[in-house]
């Protein structure tokens, strides 16, 4: 079972900072092979390591700058869950900026990896999100 600080580290220091660094391996190492990531408001859904890898290759490749920051985390150690509210600034290769304040809900499995990630975004998502979605 992960402690409070370990849950925050997994979400912020590994998952989000991995995205900021465009580090595909770092991001993928936070998720179980059967992880489900979904965007309820956008109908995007990625199930399993292969779909998630395709998604993150697309996402990281579509944005020259990714900046997740200003995290507020609520942790439930008993359920191995974390809610993270944050700002994210994305800049595509043409210089178009997208600024959002989003909320992710993370649920971990017994191995201390994300088994489910639920993402609530404040703006419509276009490029970087279609690949890998079923």
Model region roles, listed by residue range:
Residues 2, 7, 53-134:
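A beta-strand edge to alpha-helix "cap/lid" segment located at domain peripheries
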Residues 15, 26-28, 35, 48, ...:
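Hydrophobic pocket/interface hotspot
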Residues 15-18, 38, 90:
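Alpha-helix C-capping/helix-to-loop hinge sites
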Residues 23, 35, 64-67:
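Secondary-structure boundary/capping signal
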Residues 34, 43, 95-97:
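Generic secondary-structure boundary/loop-capping signal
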Residues 36-47, 58-62:
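A short gly/proline-enriched turn/hairpin at secondary-structure junctions
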């Amino acid at each position: 079972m992960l402690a409070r600080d370990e849950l925050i580290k997994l979400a912020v220091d590994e998952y989000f900072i991995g995205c900021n660094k465009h580090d595909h391996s770092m991001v993928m190492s936070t998720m179980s092979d059967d992880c489900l990531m979904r965007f309820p408001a956008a109908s995007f859904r990625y199930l399993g390591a292969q779909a998630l890898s395709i998604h993150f290759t697309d996402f990281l490749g579509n944005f020259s700058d990714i900046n997740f920051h200003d995290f507020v985390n609520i942790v439930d150690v008993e359920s191995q869950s974390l809610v993270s509210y944050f700002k994210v600034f994305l800049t595509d290769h043409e210089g178009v900026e997208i600024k959002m304040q989003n909320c992710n809900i993370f649920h971990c499995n017994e191995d201390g990896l994300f088994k489910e990630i639920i993402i609530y975004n404040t703006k419509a998502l276009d490029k970087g999100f279609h690949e890998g979605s079923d």
